[in-house]
């Protein structure tokens, strides 16, 4: 299992923009304008699959299935 890295919103943006530079699993705490959301990025294959979650448990479960 890959280790999940906690990153800032700016770091997450860079990972999504240049996915082949940062292979791995990432989690970021961000705001969608009204709520705080967890942004999870499965970049284990360099494809930067991204999902938003309102629960840490759900975000971790999604990343750990990678």
Regions found by a protein language model. Give the residues of each.
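A short, charged, amphipathic alpha-helix used as a generic interaction element across diverse proteins
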Residues: 10-16, 54-66
């Amino acid at each position: 299992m890959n280790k999940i890295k906690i990153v800032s919103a700016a770091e997450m943006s860079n990972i999504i923009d240049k996915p082949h530079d940062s292979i791995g699993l990432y989690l970021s705490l961000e705001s969608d304008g009204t709520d705080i959301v967890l942004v999870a990025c499965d970049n284990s294959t360099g494809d930067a699959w991204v999902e938003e979650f309102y629960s840490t448990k759900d975000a971790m479960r999604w990343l750990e299935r990678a």
